[in-house]
Regions:
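Active-site-proximal N-terminal segment of extracellular/periplasmic enzymes that hydrolyze or transfer
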Residues: 2-55, 65
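A long, amphipathic alpha-helix that forms part
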Residues: 14-15, 209-231, 238-280, 488
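Secreted, luminal/periplasmic, and some membrane-associated catalytic domains
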Residues: 26, 41, 57, 64-66, ...
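Short catalytic/ligand-binding loop motif for oxyanion handling, primarily in non-cytosolic enzymes
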Residues: 31-33, 66-68, 82-85, 155-166, ...
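Short, structured active-site-proximal loop/turn typified by the sulfatase FGly-forming signature C/S-X-P-X-R
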Residues: 35-89, 146-148
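His/Asp/Glu-rich, glycine-adjacent segments
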Residues: 78-244, 377-378, 382-410, 429, ...
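Substrate-binding rim/cap in mid-to-C-terminal beta-strand-loop elements of soluble/periplasmic
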Residues: 306-335, 453-492, 496
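Short, surface-exposed loop/helix-turn segments at secondary-structure junctions
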Residues: 444-455
């Protein structure tokens, strides 16, 4: 699919071949809500992309199906057993401390706002994301493709960016809180912290409800001035809106996201002109499910000495890491590991709202639920939908697995074996991982939850199946893959540019 060649700008670097590519990530968009928005004519830009392109309504998320893990998978094409970003909240064994990427303002305040911001903005990319995997920015930068990105959790690239000081308030904050440069795409616009050039666009320091407008402003500027071959166009406000209103409220926030996509097209001279020069991928990172009840891990594991949010370990036995509809438990007292793990599994299974308990044991993944215990490992006689092979034994009812003609699959827990295996074998994951039942969410360290609203994070299909559509790139039919996942997006981007 050939289009107009890219034009070299004063920043240097050029690429000619396929048309430019925009990767748009609408955080938390539920397929049924996107379809409703299109049906109600609230999303005309997306409707055009669907009409001219290929639409997938069941693209499988990562597990935990939570934004930092999903963002790293989208950006690298790998799961966390390779990229090493395990969850929204996790315990850093090497540094003997919690890492909190911003579950809520209250959770960040519990661990220290400054520490949470440093982990989210700096350490996630520069220390926590594995150096052994490449982001799409790094791959394309190495090929001299002009890269650009708006505020997205994973931004690591080959170009150096210093902190922005465009306004007095951002200058003050960036002198006191953020003092160091980062490596990102050629054009990086991350809230008001990093901006590779003056655009006149403001995000009010990444304030929810303003972030999509900032992305639209920056994106239209980049299109108008021909400053990219590849743009990661991040629209996070849908997720925030859905957390408050529940998934049924997404039509309004999807309409807002669509306006920013139309703004991008208008900067190119209208939708026809935009699609003549650009291919586009539009996707969600996960879906959301309505939350009706909460799970307090503090109460459930009160019998153990739980590591406190700050300060020394002081004889703590375990660390507890709630992350919306997923959670991790880390054994700190290594000498008592064999004693503690069975007790922790038993307590987790007795906790109302906990659906699955996952762990790694003697070369196998083990998932336990009220239905029994299931064990599995790669390289066996059963093939999953994507062609991975597994040895599986135990109670298939744990994951509602079906098996026939040498195949194994689950409708309730899509791509369950591969996702669970990546999670339990990730070196930074908890010793136990918990997945909540539909309708339940783990209260975070700040006491916040989304009861009455939406949330995500589990292995269940309700928050694990999302949107993926493409236009002007990729295969001609969704049937090109028997099952699409987040891991397929980075390869599609690289292939678009001949890599």
């Amino acid at each position: 699919m050939l289009g107009t060649p890219a034009t070299e700008d004063a920043a240097g670097g050029s690429w000619s071949g396929a048309r430019k590519l925009v990767l748009c990530v609408i955080d938390g968009v539920a397929p049924q809500m996107l379809e409703r928005a299109v049906e109600e004519e609230r999303a005309p830009a997306i409707a055009r992309f669907i009409e001219d392109g290929v639409y997938v309504d069941d693209c499988v998320s990562a597990f935990p199906s939570i934004t930092p893990v999903c963002a790293a998978t989208i950006a690298t094409g790998t799961a966390q057993d390779q990229h090493l970003i395990p969850n929204m909240n996790w315990y850093h064994r090497g540094e003997a401390r919690y890492v909190e990427y911003g579950s809520s303002f209250a959770a960040s305040r519990t661990f220290g706002i400054h520490r949470s911001l440093l982990d989210t903005i700096y350490n996630m990319n520069l220390a926590h994301l594995s150096p052994d995997v490449q982001t799409v920015f790094e791959s394309l930068d190495d090929a001299d493709v002009r890269t650009a990105g708006t505020t997205f959790l994973i931004y690591r690239g080959r170009h150096r960016h210093e902190i922005a000081r465009e306004t007095p308030i951002t200058g003050l904050l960036n002198r006191t809180l953020f003092r160091h440069g980062v490596w990102g795409p050629r054009e990086l616009f991350y809230a008001d912290v990093f901006a590779s050039r003056r655009t006149g666009c403001r995000s009010q320091l990444g304030l929810p409800g303003v972030r999509d407008q900032h992305t639209g402003c920056v994106g239209s500027y980049l299109v108008e001035h021909d400053l990219f071959d590849f743009l990661l166009f991040s629209l996070p406000d849908n997720d925030t809106h859905s957390h408050k209103t529940g998934p049924e409220g997404q039509v309004e926030s999807i309409a807002g996201a669509d306006r920013e996509l139309q703004r991008l097209a208008d900067a190119a001279g209208g939708m026809d002109a935009f699609l003549e020069a650009h291919a586009i991928i539009v996707m969600g990172d996960h879906s959301q499910v309505l939350i009706e009840d909460r799970i307090s891990l503090g109460e459930a594991f009160a019998a153990w000495k739980v590591r406190r949010p700050v300060g020394p370990e002081d004889g703590a036995e375990i660390a507890v890491c709630p992350a919306q509809r997923s959670a991790g438990l880390y054994v700190i007292d290594e000498e008592r590991r064999d004693e503690l793990l069975p007790e922790l599994v038993g307590t987790a299974l007795e906790t109302p709202g906990v659906d699955l308990v996952l762990r790694h044991d003697d070369g196998e993944a083990v998932i336990t639920s009220a239905q029994g215990e299931l064990r599995f490992a790669p390289d066996g006689p059963l093939a999953d939908v994507r062609g991975g092979t597994w040895s599986v034994r135990g109670d298939f009812a744990v994951l509602e697995l079906q098996s026939a003609h040498g195949g194994v699959w689950s409708d309730e827990y899509p791509d369950a074996l591969a996702r669970a295996w990546a999670a339990v074998t990730c070196p930074t994951s908890g010793d136990l991982l918990l997945s909540a039942a539909p309708g339940y969410e783990f209260t975070d360290w700040g006491g916040a939850d989304h009861v009455g609203g939406g949330s995500h994070g589990s292995l269940h299909r309700s928050d694990s199946q999302g949107v993926l559509l493409w236009c002007g790139t990729g295969p001609d039919r969704r049937e090109a893959r028997p099952q699409w996942t987040l891991r397929d997006v980075a390869p599609m981007v690289r292939q678009h540019f001949g890599l």
